[in-house]
């Protein structure tokens, strides 16, 4: 549905910190978004995490979920930027390695003023690798 260039029109993240390659589904009415990240050995973080045993840092998986959510809720929010406010109930189930494709599935639980609460899961080959609940605020740039 959205490619990388279209994603970059909606959120401020750029390489090497853009952690979603494509938005597959975006349901504004039901406040749900599904995104994808193709993980390659060329990712900057693999230089140090871990040499000879590359594993994607879990916090970056959570960040990828949040970026997908940002694409959904930042639609029409010119001059605004989403900031993390809290992360809760984070669980990492399995490592993510080069060659994996992560599917992020994120749903808004509540929006109040400029505060967004959501939950998401990350899957590789339909197996859950991570889950989290998070809060962020939408603020002026």
In which residue ranges do the predicted regions lie?
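Hydrophobic beta-strand-centered segment that forms part of the acyl-chain substrate-binding groove
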Residues: 1, 68-103, 129, 133-137
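Short aromatic-glycine motifs in intrinsically disordered, low-complexity regions
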Residues: 1-14
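Beta-strand-rich interaction surfaces with strong enrichment in secreted/lumenal proteins
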Residues: 8, 52, 92-94
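Catalytic strand-loop segment that frames the active site of acyl-thioester-processing enzymes
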Residues: 15-56
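Hydrophobic core residues within well-ordered beta-strands of beta-rich domains
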Residues: 17-19, 102, 116
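Conserved positions in beta-strands of structured domains
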Residues: 21-24, 88, 93, 107-109, ...
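Active-site helix/loop of acyl-thioester processing domains in fatty-acid/polyketide metabolism
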Residues: 23, 56-79
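HotDog/MaoC-like acyl-thioester-processing domains
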Residues: 30-32, 96-100, 107-141
């Amino acid at each position: 549905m959205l490619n990388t260039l279209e994603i970059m029109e909606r959120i401020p993240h750029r390489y090497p910190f853009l952690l979603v390659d494509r938005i597959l589904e975006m349901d504004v009415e039901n406040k749900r978004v599904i995104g994808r990240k193709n993980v390659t050995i060329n990712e900057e973080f693999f230089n140090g995490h871990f040499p000879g045993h590359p594993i994607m840092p879990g916090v970056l998986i959570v960040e990828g979920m949040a970026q997908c959510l940002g694409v959904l809720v930042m639609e029409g929010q010119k001059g605004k930027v989403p900031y993390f406010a809290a992360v809760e109930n984070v669980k990492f189930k399995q490592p993510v390695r080069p060659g994996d494709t992560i599917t992020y599935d994120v749903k808004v639980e509540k929006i109040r003023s400029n505060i967004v609460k959501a939950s998401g899961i990350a899957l590789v080959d339909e197996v859950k690798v991570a889950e989290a609940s998070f809060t962020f605020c939408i603020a002026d740039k």
